[in-house]
A protein has these predicted regions:
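C-terminal accessory helical subdomains adjacent to catalytic cores in phosphodiester-
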Residues: 2-17, 25, 31-46, 51-180
């Protein structure tokens, strides 16, 4: 995503990616501390994380805590995926409501990328954003369908929504800055 961003309206856009390996609430604590001591200020802080094997209570609390910490000067965004981040690129290829494990999701993404693009998927694949971004509109529509699907089932907690992701919400803010 960082490579695809461009300056617009002479506003500064800085993307700082910090892979911490931390789980939900520790990730939020890390982000808050980083914001306190960083020389630059941040209007938006996106926390991207998976359900993984973390306790449902922590996974579900993250969104609420992000909202509590957000104020008029800075917004913390909980961009969770259940079961894993790979659901976001998978939704660029197809819609699914099938409950899945992280390995199921990664396998499905690998199949779609191989079949549709002739690309072998592997975790942390460089250039993944550029490969799938042409279908972002379709992915966002599929995310919307998943929201409606889970709402219809009464699944309000993130931990109960499998599959589901909020990763696409980042484009509400950065979309205007993307080249092309």
């Amino acid at each position: 995503v960082r490579a695809a961003l461009c300056a617009a309206d002479e506003r500064k856009v800085a993307v700082i990616v910090k892979g911490t390996g931390k789980h939900t609430l520790d990730l939020l604590d890390f982000a808050v501390e980083h914001c306190l001591y960083a020389p630059e200020t941040f209007d938006h802080v996106w926390l991207v994380y998976d359900k993984d094997d973390f306790p449902a209570s922590d996974f579900d609390a993250m969104e609420r805590k992000c909202n509590e910490l957000s104020d008029g000067s800075r917004t913390f965004h909980a961009l969770w995926s259940n079961p894993c981040f790979e659901l976001w690129p998978l939704l660029h290829f197809r819609y699914t409501t099938a409950h899945m494990s992280a390995s199921d999701c990664q396998h499905a993404l690998a199949q779609e990328m191989s079949r549709d693009l002739g690309i072998e998927y592997r975790k942390n694949l460089d250039g993944l954003f550029e490969v799938v971004d042409g279908k972002r509109g379709e992915a966002l529509q599929r995310v919307g369908r998943l929201v409606t699907y889970h709402r219809g089932l009464g699944n309000v907690k993130p931990s109960a929504q499998n599959p589901a992701t909020k990763v696409g919400e980042i484009f509400d803010v950065i979309g205007p800055y993307l080249a092309g």
